[in-house]
Amino acid sequence: MPIVDELEVKLLHPDAALPARTRPGDAGYDLRCVEPFVLRPGERALVPTGLAVALPPGLAGLVLPRSGLAHRHGVTCANSPGLIDPNYRGELRVVLVNLGRDTYRGHAGDRIAQLLLVPYWAPELRVVDELPDSERGEAGFGSSGR
């Protein structure tokens, strides 16, 4: 598992804010938007953060919804989690969707999502004729009951 003490962040916009954790024990870094936006019910928008990052090899970024925004307004990340590969150097943008009943107005500087850094592995894939048995087997959706 990669251990890093610093993450390189490039500010692409004069109003961009460094991602920040609200409390010392928080896992996610809040991402803020740099422009106002309006989301009518059912609409999606690609919202800029004004940031780019250089993730080290072995770490990926997951863009996750903010629970309060989803609970209070029905606004969440449409492709949650959004994946940031370590070789991506472009602007971090968040696909927000309004699942609520009311129009949502975002303001520059609002916290719109969270960035979670996670280790990943990329093993070589091998095609097999049979998979090993498991206790669950092929039991899928709804198989564990209510």
Question: Where do the model's predicted regions map?
Answer:
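DUTPase catalytic domain/fold
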Residues: 1-146
